[in-house]
């Protein structure tokens, strides 16, 4: 059931990350060129693109699952990856096992611990994120309202706290936090104007850090440190030129500040440093793959043997399939290849362009999928957006530079690149995310065959339903009906404009590629380093805090306690108690993860319902929204625990 859910929820990832960029380019004034919008969608075009994306994502999702058969052998059998955070799911499965085997009291205690911390997490997030205070046309979380109320002029809590983040002093405008320190000619002396330091109040990142421990968490943060304390300040300090879509020219970054100031560090990060980070993710991943070439050769040899009819270990006589048949991998590759050509040709693109996309998809899903699996296994975070940028770069590089040969207009080239990247996002997400299902199956005895089967069953409904909702929200986002950050979609839209106008700094990608290779050679975790550089300090710092907290807890609290037990009851009892005590902390961490997951899901649903209400600021809706939210969570808790 869990594997089917994984397939259903991640088959539409590409639509969530990439597809909204199409509507932003068509409707958002920020991406208009001097000649008008880069993309113009006629009646029926959106439906046509959605049809192509949904059907193609199904096949791509199947391919992603097939490729993981190879990755499972490499990074779960030959060279196992830790996958921080999988312990939480494993503990939940352990609770279910206790119930089935009669250990009901132990299961109840475990479930109670997780439930208590889930509740504490949701209450905390309710105060931090739920729009409890409605004033005029603004909806504020309680903590944001307190911060703004406790501010006088440019001084007060709002300067150091906003939107769930405790951050460096940023200043305020009318009592509202500016979020980031503004750079201007008058504030050029301020070191905070060149970087962004803070801590996001996210329990899940602390929990993941707890699972990681200090070393792995530090390596992820090392990329963040290099990005935010070295590269970003350099870009701002040396007035590095960045591309401006409206003027269609490279503009020195300090020119954006004008006389009033601007958050140049965020501009430097989004326009330059993230490009280096993407290169680092790919460079570290490629070098890591090169180090594992012998293992890959052995697996490809097994696939070749399976195609020749030679005996293999995936089928057990009298017991059935243990692993999905290896011979199906090339069959799925061929099926996906020709399906992509057919789908995109029916969708109105030339056969040659469809052929090129199909080839890129087959190749990149394997190579970048391997990188995604590795990053997911090392950090618990999947770099879907980073790897998708590489695919978009490849597709636009080919389509925009061979428009006459491929019979493509500039609009067609952009659309094909974005739809193709959407499809890739679904494939890469399936390859990377399913590692959690397979990791848990190793511990509980499920056959990989059944996990693969569940993943495949979930792809079709997930692609249809998830894509439908994502498209609906994309249209509303572009029209301005709803306000969402959509950082990945905006980044893809910006990227598309840059390449359509033949601008951009490809050498930054190459620089990042070399940096990622070096860190992979030096530490063995170049992809984690690149991912850290891709994220902001407030997002990664909680992981480091969590990892350091666990090491300190083990050293100061756990070790003395275990040493005492060892003296009194012997080594065997001490090791047993150590495992039980450590598992109890995993249950707390599981509660933190579960609480944030529940709250995030419910908040997304409520935000969606907000768009359907005639007057989203009506008092009746305020009461109904709040009462519904509370009753929903009380009901869920009652059903689980009573």
Give residue spans per PLM region.
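Alpha-helical multipass membrane-protein architecture
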Residues: 1-642
């Amino acid at each position: 059931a869990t594997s089917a859910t994984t397939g259903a929820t991640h088959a539409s990832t590409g639509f969530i990350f990439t597809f909204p960029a199409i509507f932003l380019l068509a409707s958002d004034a920020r991406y208009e060129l001097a000649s008008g919008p880069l993309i113009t969608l006629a009646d029926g075009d959106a439906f046509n693109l959605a049809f192509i994306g949904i059907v193609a994502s199904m096949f791509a999702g199947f391919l992603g699952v097939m490729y993981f058969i190879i990755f499972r052998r490499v990074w779960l059998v030959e060279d196992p990856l830790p996958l921080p955070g999988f312990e939480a799911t494993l503990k939940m499965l352990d609770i279910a096992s206790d119930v089935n085997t009669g250990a009901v009291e132990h299961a109840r205690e475990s479930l109670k611990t997780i439930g208590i911390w889930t509740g504490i997490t949701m209450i905390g997030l309710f105060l931090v994120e739920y729009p409890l205070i409605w004033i005029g046309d603004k909806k504020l979380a309680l903590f944001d309202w307190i911060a703004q109320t406790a501010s006088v002029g440019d001084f007060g809590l709002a300067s150091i706290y906003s939107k769930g983040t405790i951050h460096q002093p940023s200043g305020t405008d009318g009592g509202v936090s500016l979020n980031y320190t503004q750079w201007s000619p008058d504030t050029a002396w301020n070191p905070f104007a060149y970087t962004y330091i803070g801590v996001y109040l996210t329990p899940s990142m602390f929990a993941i850090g707890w699972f990681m421990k200090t070393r792995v968490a530090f390596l992820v943060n090392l990329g963040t440190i290099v990005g935010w304390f070295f590269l970003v300040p350099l870009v701002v300090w040396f007035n590095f030129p960045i591309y401006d879509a409206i003027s269609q020219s490279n503009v020195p970054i300090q020119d954006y500040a004008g006389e009033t100031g601007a958050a140049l560090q965020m501009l430097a990060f989004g326009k330059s440093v993230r490009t280096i980070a993407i290169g680092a993710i790919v460079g570290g991943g490629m070098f890591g793959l090169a180090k594992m070439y012998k293992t890959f050769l052995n697996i490809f040899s097994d696939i070749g043997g399976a195609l020749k009819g030679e005996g293999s270990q995936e089928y057990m006589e009298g017991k059935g399939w243990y692993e999905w048949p290896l011979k199906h991998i090339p069959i799925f590759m061929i099926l996906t290849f020709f399906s992509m050509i057919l789908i995109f040709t029916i969708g109105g693109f030339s056969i040659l362009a469809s052929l090129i996309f199909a080839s890129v998809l087959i190749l990149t899903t394997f190579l970048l999928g391997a990188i995604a699996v590795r990053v997911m296994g090392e950090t618990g975070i999947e770099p879907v957006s980073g790897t998708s940028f590489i695919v978009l770069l490849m597709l636009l590089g080919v389509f925009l530079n061979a428009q006459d040969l491929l019979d493509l207009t500039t609009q067609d080239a952009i659309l094909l690149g974005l739809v193709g990247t959407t499809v890739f996002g679904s494939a890469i997400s399936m390859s990377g995310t399913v590692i959690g299902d397979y990791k848990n199956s190793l511990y509980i005895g499920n056959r990989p065959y059944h996990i693969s089967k569940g993943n495949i069953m979930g792809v079709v409904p997930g692609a249809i339903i998830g894509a439908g909702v994502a498209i609906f929200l994309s249209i509303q986002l572009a029209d301005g009906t709803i306000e969402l950050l959509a950082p990945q979609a905006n980044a893809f839209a910006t990227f598309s404009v840059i390449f359509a106008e033949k601008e951009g700094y490809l050498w930054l990608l190459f620089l990042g590629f070399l940096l990622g290779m070096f860190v992979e050679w030096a530490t063995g975790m170049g992809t984690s380093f690149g991912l850290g550089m891709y994220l902001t300090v407030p997002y990664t710092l909680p992981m480091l805090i969590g990892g350091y907290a666990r090491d300190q807890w083990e050293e100061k609290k756990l070790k003395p306690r275990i040493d005492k037990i060892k003296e009194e009851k012997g080594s065997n009892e001490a090791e047993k108690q150590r495992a039980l005590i450590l598992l109890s902390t995993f249950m707390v961490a599981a509660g933190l993860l579960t609480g944030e997951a529940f709250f995030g899901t419910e908040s997304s649903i409520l935000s969606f319902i907000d768009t359907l209400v005639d007057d989203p600021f009506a008092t009746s809706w305020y009461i109904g929204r709040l009462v519904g939210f509370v009753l929903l969570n009380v009901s869920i808790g009652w059903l689980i625990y009573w």
